[in-house]
Amino acid sequence: MIIKFGRKVLQWLNFADEDIQLARHALTLSTAVPYRLVAYHAQQCAEKSLKAYLVRHRIDFPYTHNISRLLEICSKPAQWDNPMWDAEELTVYAVTTRYPGEDEEVSRDEALRAIALAELVRKTVQLKLNEDR
């Protein structure tokens, strides 16, 4: 797989996989689950998956956590189905979940939706990468 995708692409994908695994694992904690961190790691999975796609296609991208922006940049070589654009919802979790502030806590339902969206992005990126081989 390294030969097919390249080392950098695999590094981005591995980091994305670690983020989603951590998000899923947090849901199994017997103590109070930090849903904001579940949502944060889901956002990170989606972001890193999209960046892996851009690295694979040798497309420069800005330093950003904005999923909408990354989807737009990725749309040059790939056409995404409409459900992928729902992942724009994840952008808010990139910063607001990491620092104290006025924002409301993330609910279990919101955390589960964040995981589902991140998994959709990760799976779709993997399918697109496989098509490119």
Region annotations inferred by a language model:
Residues 1-133:
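Terminal alpha-helical segments
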